[in-house]
A protein has these predicted regions:
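Charged low-complexity interaction tracts in eukaryotic proteins
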Residues: 16-58
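Catalytic alpha/beta active-site cores
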Residues: 61-334, 339-340, 358, 365-372, ...
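Short acidic, hydrophobic short linear motifs in intrinsically disordered regions
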Residues: 2-10
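Flexible glycine/proline-rich, aromatic-decorated loop/lid segments
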Residues: 319-323, 361-375, 383-410, 415, ...
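Flexible, glycine-rich loop/tail regions that form catalytic "lids" or insertion modules at the edges
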Residues: 71-72, 77-98, 107-111, 162, ...
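Short beta-alpha connecting loops at secondary-structure transitions
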Residues: 177-181, 245-255, 288-293, 331-339, ...
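Short, basic interhelical loop/turn and adjoining N-cap
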Residues: 12-18, 581
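Phosphate/diphosphate-binding loops
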Residues: 187, 205, 210-213, 225-227, ...
């Protein structure tokens, strides 16, 4: 593009006049700095202006030229978020024309909760630093947790291995090769005792990332506490218990959706009666994003699942204000800092509206979208792994600026395996540096009122409502999942993202740009080759030392409850107290409920 073409471009964009002399001066500045000469030796011909240089010329010209009413329409090159939301070069007050800050923004801790769920947010206390951890044996995970607590972690978060997630004991043939690999292996109440050894369960909160077998793990946790003389009413924590996203994004489901929803709502009712301070679900967008969704899809599909859980609980006989205050959410913090901040703010505002208008909630606590955040695991790269420290820092910062209640920062080595102790410590220190050194905790919602952030928040929300309307038209989240709608949308988004990385239009430093060819040595977390055999021996002894007839009778009560309408967690707890294993309880429900196989 020549100077005449550049001036014409600006004129066509809606400017009443174009000061060509000022523009020529800006162009001359670039020539004087040698930038155009360098460009001419590259792929742009003589007399042509490269896009980056054109961008600098426009920026310098704008500093000299009075602002026009159409300034926001000028772009040297079009920019969009991964959702396709256009990003302008400059945002002004005109981009928020007609926008009512009292209605759309409000005050922190008050409707519509855009600015946060609590009036003082981090001025009151920092977010909970809850580092996700779990691997190998219960003893090994217990030691890692104690290390994290000693280094300043303020909450626990447990990762379970795949057999535990899928309801198989460690000696089951289908567990072979997976025991303790991606999380801790928990089969029995003895395992849970070892996992929680020496931890003050009445003083800390524990989050458990578990879904199909959520009820079993929660009950084992409760039984251990009771064995120590700690009443269930003093226990605090969160159970993920979000089975719908398993059908959409992860795949660790066991039973058909509708039977799984019964387990979810039975857990709601059980906790309301017996474990009142426990968050009964963590409605999860994290895994939806990890599967390849966009930020808008993450919001829309997660809130759609949330609507389905509320509807199911009401259908099960619970009043909305009896359970909704214990609902929580779990989001991903991805790479685009401002889009992520907008996502968190939009989701909070949308949920308050859903609970008020759709479900008639009157307790303000029922309207609060309280959430945990984890930095985006899928963004980490095996190439130049130290770069991941920077990625994690920016992602964690977006979660804090977006008002998270708790946060996990990934280890920089998680693209190649479980985090080493060093990587876990660096991740925790990342959170502590943000909290103690950056100043972001000093004022609530520091980005409020930004022309860009508020415009982006509005755009994310508007597009998410469009998705929710489509899902409602399909009959709700369960019907949309059964029809494959969410899965198809995520697949298309994931393909588009991968294609952009492949063709270089989406830059990933160290992967498709700034590749130096140097292989950086990296310590890899070692797995225990003796664990699987050792777990099998433990299970053999465990079964031999218990009252087999008592276990069988207790499991029959679980089966009878599954055939009826009784809350399943009551007989499940009795069976686990009789020393039934996780796999045995799950097998009873497999026989009664069947297992789910997706169509096609």
């Amino acid at each position: 593009m020549s100077i005449g073409g550049l001036a014409g471009y600006l004129g066509a964009a809606g400017f009443d006049q174009v000061d060509r002399k000022t523009l020529a001066d800006a162009l001359g500045h670039e020539v004087a700095r040698g930038r155009l000469r360098r460009v001419e030796r590259g792929r742009y011909g003589r007399g042509e202006i490269a896009p980056r240089t054109r961008y600098r010329i426009l920026a310098r010209w704008r500093r000299s030229f009075p602002l026009s009413r159409n300034l926001t329409t000028v772009d040297a090159d079009e920019r969009r978020t991964d959702d396709g939301i256009p990003v302008q070069t400059v945002y002004t007050a005109q981009d928020l024309a007609g926008w009512d800050p009292e209605k759309r923004l409000g005050q922190p801790g008050k409707p519509p909760y855009t600015r946060g769920v609590y009036p003082t947010m981090y001025r009151g206390r920092p977010w909970t630093m809850r580092q996700y951890s779990g691997f190998g044996s219960a003893d090994a995970t217990n030691q890692r947790w104690k290390m994290l607590l000693a280094n300043g972690s303020t909450g626990l978060s447990c990762a379970f291995d795949l057999p535990t997630q899928m309801g198989y004991d460690s000696d089951h043939p289908r567990a072979e090769g997976e025991v303790g690999k991606v999380g801790v292996a928990i089969d029995t109440i003895d395992d849970m005792h070892r996992l929680l050894d020496g931890l003050p369960l009445d003083q800390i909160t524990t989050s458990m990332t578990i879904n199909s077998t959520a009820a079993v793990l929660l009950l084992l946790y409760q039984l251990v506490a009771e064995d120590r003389g700690i009443p269930a009413g003093k226990l605090g924590g969160t159970i993920q218990n979000d089975i719908l996203k398993e059908y959409v994004a992860r795949g660790t489901y066991i039973y058909p959706p509708r039977q799984s929803m019964r387990l979810v709502t039975d857990l709601f009712g059980y906790c309301r009666q017996y474990v009142p301070n426990w968050n009964t679900i963590s409605i999860s967008g994290y895994h939806i994003r990890e599967a390849g969704s966009t930020a808008v899809q993450e919001v829309a599909f997660t809130l759609a699942n949330g609507i389905a859980y509320v509807e199911a609980a009401i259908e099960a006989g619970l009043a909305v204000d009896e359970f909704a205050s214990r609902l929580s959410f779990f989001w991903n913090a991805h790479n685009n800092l401002f889009e992520e901040v907008a996502k968190f703010r939009a989701a909070r505002r949308m949920w308050a509206r859903i609970m008020t208008e759709r479900f008639g909630a009157t307790d303000e606590r029922s309207k609060l979208l309280r959430f945990h955040t984890q930095t985006g695991g899928s963004t980490l790269t095996a190439q130049q792994p130290e770069n991941n420290v920077v990625r994690v820092t920016l992602q964690a910062l977006s979660a804090v600026l977006g008002g998270t209640q708790s946060l996990h920062a990934n280890g920089f080595d998680e693209a190649v395996g479980l985090p080493t102790e060093r990587a876990a410590r660096v991740a925790l220190r990342t959170q502590q540096i943000i909290a103690a050194e950056s100043g972001v905790v000093d004022t609530v919602d520091p980005l409020a009122g930004s022309y860009f952030v508020e415009s982006l928040t509005e755009a994310v929300e508007a597009r998410a409502w469009e998705y929710l309307d489509k899902i409602d038209g399909l009959g709700g989240a369960v019907a949309a999942i059964e029809a494959g709608f969410m899965q198809d949308e995520i697949e298309r988004a994931a393909f588009a993202y991968a294609q952009a990385v492949d063709d270089g239009s989406k830059v990933v430093v160290g992967v498709n740009a700034y590749v130096d060819g140097e292989v950086q040595p990296l310590d890899v977390f070692p797995s225990d080759p003796t664990l699987e055999a050792g777990k099998a021996e433990q299970l053999t002894r465990f079964r031999a030392e218990r009252d087999a007839a008592g276990v069988d009778a207790a499991l029959e009560q679980v089966a009878a409850a599954a055939r009826g309408t009784q809350n399943l967690l009551v007989p499940m707890k009795a069976a686990l107290a009789c020393r039934a294993t996780l796999g045995e309880v799950s097998d009873v429900l497999r026989r009664e409920f069947g297992t789910y196989r997706p169509a096609g």
